Design a protein with these regions (language model features):
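Short, solvent-exposed amphipathic helices
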Residues: 107, 128-135, 139-142
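Short alpha-helical elements of helix-turn-helix
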Residues: 19, 23, 51, 110
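Basic, helix-initiating cap at the start of DNA-binding domains
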Residues: 1-32, 36-45, 61-65
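Hydrophobic/aromatic-rich alpha-helical bundle segments in the mid-to-C-terminal region
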Residues: 126-130, 148-196, 203-216
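Amphipathic alpha-helical segments used for helix-helix packing
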Residues: 92, 104-127
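Short hydrophobic/aromatic patch on the recognition helix
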Residues: 46-57
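Hydrophobic alpha-helical connector segments
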Residues: 66, 77-109, 159-166, 189, ...
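Short, basic, alpha-helical segments at the C-terminal edge of helix-turn-helix-like DNA-binding modules
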Residues: 69-74
Length: 216
């Protein structure tokens, strides 16, 4: 999440305070876990009174909403870069995988895992994560459609399946980045790129012979 993409001098005071609080919330959530982090801890981390904090964010859920909004902006920028890339779509996606997934700082990945865990307990947070997941899958479907139209992906690849598979695969990478102290992005890159190439080549697909979920 790029909290500081706008130069400090250009931000209005309210926006500067909002960024300051969200950065503090990130640190507190990563260090203590979302569930154990209190509003007072975030206020202390931000160096302000609890009253000032509540005036900007009335709850932890509101902070998560702010973080999710920033995440959506970053996602939109990332996909815009991919679609505007002058290289072949496969090469653009390869670079995007390196930049936005494998190079994810561990603390950012841990924040994602904390939010996902809270989504299992908190319906409001769950709704936010579902909205982002749906947006990511929709954008991936468009990207895969573009790859198929250009010949960079197999016409056999179902775009909806491809998007769902890729989201699931990336979530696993984020979990490993968050929890494995010795995670080495460079060592993992050949595997990740190989999976992406296999997906676009149509080598990965649902099992057509799998029984229905309700079958005995």
């Amino acid at each position: 999440m790029s909290l500081t993409s706008v130069p400090v001098g250009r931000r209005p005071p309210d926006a500067e305070r909002r960024v300051r609080i969200l950065e503090a919330a990130e640190r507190a959530f990563v260090r203590n876990g979302f569930h154990a982090t209190t509003m007072q801890r975030v206020a202390d981390e931000a160096g302000m009174s609890a009253g000032n904090l509540y005036r900007t964010f009335p709850s932890k859920e509101a902070m998560v909403e702010g973080l999710c909004e920033l995440d959506q902006v970053e996602l939109a920028q990332a996909f815009a870069e991919l679609m505007a890339d002058n290289r072949q779509i496969m090469e653009a996606m390869r670079c995007g995988l390196r930049k936005h997934v494998l190079a994810k700082p561990p603390e950012k990945a841990r924040l994602l895992v904390e939010i996902w865990a809270e989504a299992g307990r908190n319906p409001r947070v769950a709704a936010m994560t579902r909205a982002i997941d749906a947006e990511v899958r929709a954008r991936l479907e468009k990207l895969i459609d573009a790859a198929k139209a250009s010949g960079a992906a197999s016409p056999r690849l179902d775009s909806r399946f491809g998007a769902l598979f890729f989201v699931t695969f990336v979530a696993g990478l984020f979990k490993r980045i968050a929890t494995e102290a010795d995670f080495d992005p460079e060592a993992e890159t050949p595997m990740a790129i190989g999976v992406l190439k296999a997906l676009l080549a149509g080598a990965l697909c649902p099992d057509p012979g799998a029984p229905d979920a309700g079958a005995q």
